């Protein structure tokens, strides 16, 4: 099950109490204090693991805590430190304060291990309180209390290319055609209910990761449809590929306008990312050339045919306000799919 948001309360361990103890041995009269210190409470860590892809392990858990430190003992023996709590999360997991929405830590790299909550310090045993005035102290410190906080974990997938389009425009068909991902594909809207990642191999030495998210509809940034819960998954993508359906009842210009507006409403940073446009399902389109021409006029672009591309910029004079390319494709017939992969790789290399 794909779970990308959970809320739970995390607590470190309470420090163990120091011991009140006196040396008791044969032939030792009035042995001095020998109470050991309490053990420190367990810490809380977040650990980033590439083999984990969801937050499902934490669904339904209201609270998790590390172990308390054990109390000190006689003979100046320190109590055992509490066992730490490690939360294994996938790359792209952000940890927020559930009350203030403050970002507390961001887990993005394989092997990253972040100390999140420190366990309470163990209390001092009565051995530490012996002095010239009081040779037999009968008190010790209690352990320090644990730290506790309610957090919200949000998973935002990390990919190179994010697919942006209305439902049923061919995003899942494309990612299954170019990568190892096998999303559910059917001829109805919202077939994709969870995000999918696919590794696209361009040649023997190059490739990139593509993310397919559920289709965007007008009002998605305000929570309509599957809304913001999935728009967040393209936040970390390096570039965006807008999928414009040439066989849709909406005009190409209407589709593009709504998609750009929803992305901009959701995040101005995301809206400023470099992007390209794929005109999909050209095998099923009518009046394709005429409709493409009208679309390009609507976004103030002059056609500059470059091979199979109806529009393509020169990377050396790149204008980020315009798409890098506009390419008609068909995932069903593999028309221009190789050209699409190489062009996306070119744009990604510009980002490096």
From Swiss-Prot:
Q: What is its EC number?
A: 3.6.5.-
Q: State if Translocase is listed as a keyword.
A: no
Alphabetically sorted, this entry's keywords are: Cytoplasm, GTP-binding, Hydrolase, Magnesium, Metal-binding, Nucleotide-binding
Renumbered to this chain, the signal peptide range is none
- Any one of the GO CC terms: cytoplasm
Q: Which Gene3D superfamilies match?
A: GTP1/OBG domain (2.70.210.12), P-loop containing nucleotide triphosphate hydrolases (3.40.50.300)
Q: According to its UniProt record, which cofactors does this protein need?
A: Mg(2+)
Q: Where does Mg(2+) bind?
A: 172, 192
Output the PROSITE patterns linked to this UniProt entry.
Answer: G_OBG (PS51710), GTP1_OBG (PS00905), OBG (PS51883)
Write down the PANTHER family for this protein, in alphabetical order: DEVELOPMENTALLY REGULATED GTP-BINDING PROTEIN-RELATED, MITOCHONDRIAL RIBOSOME-ASSOCIATED GTPASE 2
- Quote the protein name from its UniProt record: GTPase Obg
Organism whose genome encodes this protein:
Campylobacter concisus (strain 13826)
This protein's encoding gene = obg
């Amino acid at each position: 099950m794909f779970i990308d948001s959970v809320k739970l309360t995390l607590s470190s361990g309470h420090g163990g109490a120091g011991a009140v103890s006196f040396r008791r041995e044969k032939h030792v009269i009035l042995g001095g204090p020998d109470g050991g210190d309490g053990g420190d409470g367990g810490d809380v860590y977040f650990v980033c693991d590439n083999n984990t892809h969801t937050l499902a392990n934490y669904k339904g858990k209201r609270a998790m805590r590390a172990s308390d430190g054990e109390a000190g003992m006689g003979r100046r023996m320190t109590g055992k430190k509490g066992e730490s709590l490690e939360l294994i999360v996938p790359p792209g997991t952000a940890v927020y304060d559930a009350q203030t929405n403050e970002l507390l830590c961001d887990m993005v790299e394989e092997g990253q291990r972040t100390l999140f909550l420190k366990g309470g310090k163990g209390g001092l045993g009565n051995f530490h309180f012996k002095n010239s005035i009081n040779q037999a102290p009968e008190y010790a410190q209690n352990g320090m209390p644990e730290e506790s906080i309610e957090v919200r974990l949000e998973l935002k997938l990390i990919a190179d290319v994010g697919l942006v389009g209305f439902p049923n425009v061919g995003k899942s068909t494309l990612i299954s055609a170019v990568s190892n991902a096998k999303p559910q594909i059917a001829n109805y809207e919202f077939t994709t209910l969870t995000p999918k990642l696919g590794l696209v191999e361009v040649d023997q030495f190059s490739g990139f990761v593509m993310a397919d998210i559920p289709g965007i509809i007008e009002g998605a940034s305000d929570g309509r449809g599957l809304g913001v819960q999935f728009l967040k998954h393209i936040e970390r993508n390096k570039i965006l590929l807008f999928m414009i359906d040439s066989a849709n009842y909406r005009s190409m210009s209407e589709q593009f306008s709504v998609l750009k507006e929803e992305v901009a409403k959701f995040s101005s940073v995301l809206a400023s990312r470099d992007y390209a446009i794929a005109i999909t399902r050209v095998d099923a389109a009518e009046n394709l050339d005429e409709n493409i021409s009208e679309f390009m006029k609507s976004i103030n672009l002059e056609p500059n045919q470059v091979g199979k591309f109806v529009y393509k910029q020169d990377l050396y004079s790149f204008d980020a306000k315009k798409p890098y390319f506009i390419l008609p494709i068909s995932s069903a017939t593999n028309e221009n799919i190789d050209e699409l992969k190489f062009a996306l790789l070119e744009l990604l290399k510009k980002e490096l």
